[in-house]
Every structure is written in structure tokens, then in C-alpha cells.
Curated annotation (Swiss-Prot):
GO terms for cellular component: cytoplasm. It is an enzyme of class 2 (transferase). It is found in: Cytoplasm. SUPFAM superfamilies: NAD kinase/diacylglycerol kinase-like. Its cofactor is a divalent metal cation. InterPro entries: ATP-NAD_kinase_N (IPR017438), ATP-NAD_kinase_PpnK-typ_C (IPR017437), NAD/diacylglycerol_kinase_sf (IPR016064), NADK (IPR002504). NAD(+) binds at D75, G76, N149, D150, R177, D179, T190, A191, Y192, A193, L194, S195, A214, Q248. This is NAD kinase. The active site is at D75 (proton acceptor). The keyword Glycosyltransferase does not apply. Its main location: cytoplasm.
Length: 300
């Protein structure tokens, strides 16, 4: 049960089909339980690692019962559970099992030291925005989805360019011939949007970025919009066009379909260790100033 800001029930979520993840998850569960917290597991995680002795819950049950969810895996795992728990405002702690992640910012080697401190109430909290999107065909909505990183309209690998008509708040912006168009949150600005030459948006910036994918005209540049913008993207030309949400769910599109995107009413709380720095994450992930000293890290 959730009681104010006090943590009582902790949910554990692990990346699926990952060798070597069972042992650290089981060790983390036992250490948290020893501290007096109730520990529950996301159901698929519990089945995959074969753990017994802890309740196995659906994401909806976790949202209703847990005070915080700890995710051990990569950014993709965090994105998936974040979308599912968004309606419940369950805070997330991200532990990276592998390379440094943008949103799973705690190294697995540090989790035993940092998690008890954070569960005791010593953490930094921030809210991350999401997008909600729907596909409209012949005037009727046929599909709805949330996206933590981005909504991407693109062509299949062997078809030609697509032509897209983009409008913002009911006002025509442009027709664009390209391989596709990315609509990204600030969190998603360091994902596919970044590889398509989009700008990095700080997670606390209230914005949405539109980034063309390999546009035919070099004048089609990325643009940052206010986060209350209502974006409509219509399929004007091309074939084998798809839309995906965080690269985790995909839907085929037809000519004249429209994808409507806006900021979701939901946000996802992220919990970070005291001293967390977004700029340190950027520097390490993007290999900026790789020879920085420890003093530089502390100053950031």
C-alpha cells in the first residue's frame, strides 16, 4: 500500500532473455527484504529467472501495490515498464546491467551500496514526460499508444521516400519528402533523434522535437516545439510506411492516415542517487572529454 512518500513495497523488474541477470536480481531482492521492505516481482521477470518466495505481479498490480519499482536492465526495459506504470505514477530507479544507459543511470556494481540509501529517502527526483499518439484512418481513431522516447514514422528498408504533411496546432507547417519523421520527448532526444542530427533537450525542458530522417531537402531541419503542441502527420505519398513507438511496438500505415501526437497527461517519476548529474551521463555516454579528472566528475 502507498502511504505518502514512505516506501513499503518495492517491485523488481528485469530485462528479459538476459544471461547472468538472475543472480543480481535475487541478491537485490533478498537484501531489500532484509531491510524490512515487502518485495514483489514483475511476473515475466519472476518466471524467467525462476525465483520463488516473492509475489509475481502484473504491471497493473505493481502500479496499485508498489511504492517504487527498481529496474535492472537497459534503457529499453525502463522504457517498457515506464509506459505501463505511468498511469500509476510509480517512481522508477534504473540500474544498468551492461553499458551505461541514459535512463538506467546506476551501475550494477553500485546497486548494493546505493539502493538502501535511496529506499531510506535520500534521492533526487525528477519527472519525465511522455507522448500519447493515435492513428486516424477515414476520420476514425484505430490505434492508441504511449511513447517515452519517440513516435517515429518511417519507410520500410526497401521502399522509396515517403511524403509527409506536418501540421502543428491545426496550422500547416510543411510537406516533407524523406525517410521519415521523428517526434521525440526530451528523454528521447538522445535516442534515434540524436542519430538523425537532432538537438539534445534537457529532460526538464518543456519541449517536443521534430527531426526529419534523411530529408530530400537540406532545408528540412529539426525544430523544437512547445510541449503543449498538437502535432499531426499525414501520409501523403509513399508505400510500406510504418509508425513505431519507442521502437517497441509497430503499426503499418496507409495513404491519408494521420498520426496525431501530443504530450501525455502522465509523467514518470525518476529517482536518482544524491549528486546525480545529467551532464555527467551525457559526457560518459557520448564520450565527451574522456580524460576528465575525478574532480571534474565531482564538480558536475
Amino acid at each position: 500500500m502507498k502511504t505518502g512518500n514512505q516506501f513499503k513495497t518495492v517491485a523488481l523488474v528485469g530485462r528479459s532473455n538476459t544471461p547472468g541477470i538472475a543472480e543480481p536480481l535475487a541478491t537485490l531482492a533478498d537484501s531489500i527484504a532484509t531491510l524490512g521492505f515487502e518485495v514483489v516481482f514483475e511476473g515475466d521477470t519472476a518466471r524467467e529467472i525462476g525465483i520463488a518466495g516473492y509475489p509475481a505481479l502484473t504491471p497493473a498490480e505493481i502500479g496499485a501495490r508498489a511504492d517504487v519499482a527498481i529496474v535492472l536492465g537497459g534503457d529499453g526495459t525502463m522504457l517498457g515498464i515506464g509506459r505501463q506504470l505511468a498511469p500509476y505514477r510509480t517512481p522508477l530507479i534504473g540500474i544498468n546491467h551492461g553499458r551505461l544507459g541514459f535512463i538506467t543511470d546506476i551501475a550494477a556494481s553500485d546497486m548494493q551500496a546505493l539502493v538502501p540509501v535511496m529506499l531510506a529517502g535520500k534521492f533526487e527526483r525528477e519527472e519525465r514526460s511522455l507522448l500519447e499518439a493515435r492513428i486516424v484512418r477515414d476520420g476514425e481513431p484505430i490505434y492508441h499508444a504511449l511513447a517515452f522516447n519517440d513516435v517515429v514514422v518511417n519507410r520500410s528498408g526497401f521502399s522509396g521516400m515517403v511524403e509527409l504533411r506536418a501540421s502543428v496546432d491545426g496550422r500547416y507547417m510543411y510537406n516533407q519528402r524523406s525517410d521519415g519523421l521523428i517526434v521525440a520527448t526530451p528523454t528521447g532526444s538522445t535516442a534515434y533523434a540524436l542519430s538523425s542530427a537532432g538537438p539534445i533537450l534537457h529532460p526538464q525542458l518543456a519541449g517536443i522535437v521534430l527531426v526529419p530522417i534523411a530529408p530530400h531537402a537540406l532545408s528540412n531541419r529539426p525544430i523544437v516545439l512547445p510541449d503543449d503542441s498538437k502535432i499531426a502527420i499525414q501520409i501523403v505519398g509513399g508505400r510500406d510506411v510504418n509508425v513505431n513507438f519507442d521502437m517497441q511496438s509497430f503499426t503499418s500505415l496507409e495513404l491519408n492516415d494521420t498520426i496525431e501526437v501530443r504530450r501525455s497527461k502522465h509523467t514518470v517519476p525518476f529517482l536518482h542517487p544524491i549528486g546525480y548529474s545529467y551532464y555527467t551521463t551525457l559526457r560518459k555516454k557520448l564520450h565527451w572529454n574522456e580524460h576528465a579528472s575525478n574532480e571534474d566528475d565531482k564538480a558536475s
